[in-house]
């Protein structure tokens, strides 16, 4: 598989908020050969990188394993022998593209929280500018999951004539109030860490706000799993004898078991703090929280009115972060805009992470849609009843009552 890993300067960049920086650099990876009309843009999720494929590469974005290697590659759903696949790290992140930890050329110091606020619109416009640099005027498809799915929707809204097909997976037109609340709590875990220092913690003698970022990531992990998957994987088991608590406890607390689920959360949070920047977590979650498809329009359908391509909306039954009902509402808006749309619902108890861990269920409809649009053999169109009831949230009440 032909793989290109590069960083491109887009020069001065004006953000959605009106602020500018002298230079925006975007790191990207590209796979396959471009033939003029086979380009597929993949939009990564919140803490993802441009390293979407190539399991054996260890020099990309400090991630040993590509985040969607089961989907992108030769003979896979997004077949790099058929398509030229581009994935770009978004502005505000910390995997090569310019963000808070990058050096401000005007001061010689990292931006920190002097970096401009970032929105999903900024991600889309930076991707459009990158594709211009690469000589790609038009896309066969844009594909992405979670907030990457919001990025996909924004492409249909802002550049409807530049893309033939869109695939928002495990996404919605906006976050609901519960998820907004949880993201706010996660950010406060970071900003109340004494090492955060108003976002300026990059000095040689500074320690990053790792405890706050670890807590934020632990909350995120719970959001991405379902009640059933957590029960199946961890239950109430105590951790093994060799497990070590990451966070200190008091003498009375030591009487009680250190559970397997706590050990899992601690381990993954510690690994996350080794590779991700706390300020980037603040910036990217705010971009996700702020996203509203209808912004500037009367409705979601109005926002999508200019898009006349094909759309495959994919959702998962146990995803309480972006529910099947929210996905159906997005599909309805696309139908109202006269787009060709199918809402493909996958029965899964993996929660929000299902789009990353179920390639056998995600791959076939995605591959068929890229090839044949909504008429693809493996593509189904489900009608999801609107309901106020939910059994998706693993901690729906307790987070607010303890």
Curated annotation (Swiss-Prot):
Under Gene Ontology molecular function, one entry of this record is: homoserine O-acetyltransferase activity
Q: InterPro entries from the xrefs? A: AB_hydrolase_1, AB_hydrolase_fold, HAT_MetX-like
Per the record, what are the reactions this protein catalyses? L-homoserine + acetyl-CoA = O-acetyl-L-homoserine + CoA
Residue positions annotated to bind substrate are 217, 353
Please list the residue ranges annotated as the AB hydrolase-1 domain: 38-359
Which residues act catalytically here?
Answer: 146, 319, 352
Name one process (GO BP) from the record.
Answer: homoserine metabolic process
UniProt pathway annotation: Amino-acid biosynthesis; L-methionine biosynthesis via de novo pathway; O-acetyl-L-homoserine from L-homoserine: step 1/1
**Does this UniProt record's set of keywords contain Transcription?**
no
Query: What is the top-level taxon of the source organism?
Result: Archaea
Q: Where are the transmembrane segments?
A: none
Kindly give the Pfam families that the UniProt entry links to this protein: Abhydrolase_1 (PF00561)
This protein's GO CC annotations: cytoplasm
* UniProt KW keywords: Acyltransferase, Amino-acid biosynthesis, Cytoplasm, Methionine biosynthesis, Transferase
| EC number(s) on file | 2.3.1.31
> Per the annotation, which location comes first and is thus the protein's main one?
cytoplasm
Subcellular location field: Cytoplasm
The keyword Electron transport belongs to this UniProt entry's keyword annotation = no
Question: Subunit arrangement?
Answer: Homodimer.
Function of this protein? Transfers an acetyl group from acetyl-CoA to L-homoserine, forming acetyl-L-homoserine.
- Do you know which PANTHER family this protein is assigned to? HOMOSERINE O-ACETYLTRANSFERASE (PTHR32268:SF11)
Family from the record = Belongs to the AB hydrolase superfamily. MetX family.
Q: What is this protein called?
A: Homoserine O-acetyltransferase
Gene name in the database record: metXA
């Amino acid at each position: 598989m032909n793989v290109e890993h590069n960083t491109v300067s887009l020069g001065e960049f004006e953000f959605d908020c009106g602020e500018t920086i002298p230079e925006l650099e975007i790191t990207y990876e590209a796979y396959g050969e471009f033939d003029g009309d086979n380009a597929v843009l993949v939009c990564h999720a919140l803490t993802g990188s441009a390293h979407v494929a190539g399991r054996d590469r260890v020099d990309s974005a400090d991630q040993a394993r590509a985040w969607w290697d089961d989907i992108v590659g030769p003979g896979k759903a997004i077949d790099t022998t058929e398509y030229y696949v581009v994935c770009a790290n978004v502005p505000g992140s910390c995997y090569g593209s310019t963000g808070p930890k990058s050096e401000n050329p005007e001061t010689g110091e990292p931006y920190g929280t002097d970096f401009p606020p970032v929105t999903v619109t900024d991600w889309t416009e930076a991707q459009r500018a990158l594709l211009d640099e690469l000589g790609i005027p038009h896309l066969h498809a844009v594909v992405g999951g979670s907030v990457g799915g919001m990025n996909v929707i924004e492409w249909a809204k802002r550049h409807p004539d530049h893309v033939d097909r869109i695939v928002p997976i495990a996404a919605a037109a906006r976050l609901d109030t519960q998820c907004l609340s949880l993201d706010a709590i996660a950010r406060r875990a970071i900003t109340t860490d004494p090492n955060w220092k108003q976002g300026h913690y990059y000095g040689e003698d500074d320690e990053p706000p790792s405890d706050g970022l670890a807590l934020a990531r632990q909350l995120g992990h719970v959001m991405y799993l379902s009640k059933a998957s957590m029960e199946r994987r961890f239950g109430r088991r105590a951790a093994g004898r060799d497990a070590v608590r990451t966070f200190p406890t008091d003498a009375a607390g030591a009487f009680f078991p250190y559970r397997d689920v706590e050990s899992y959360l601690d381990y993954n949070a510690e690994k996350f703090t080794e590779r991700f920047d706390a300020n980037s977590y603040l910036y990217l979650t705010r971009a996700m929280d702020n996203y509203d498809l209808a912004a500037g329009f009367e409705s979601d359908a109005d926002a999508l009115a200019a898009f006349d391509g094909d759309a495959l909306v994919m959702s998962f039954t146990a995803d309480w972060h972006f529910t099947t009902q929210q996905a159906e509402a997005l599909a309805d808006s696309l139908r109202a805009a006269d787009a060709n749309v199918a809402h493909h619902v996958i029965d899964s108890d993996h929660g929000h992470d299902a789009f990353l861990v179920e390639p056998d269920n995600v791959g076939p409809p995605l591959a068929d849609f890229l090839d044949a649009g909504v008429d693809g053999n493996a593509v189904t169109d489900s009608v999801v009843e609107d309901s106020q009831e939910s059994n998706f949230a693993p901690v729906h009440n307790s987070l607010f009552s303890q």
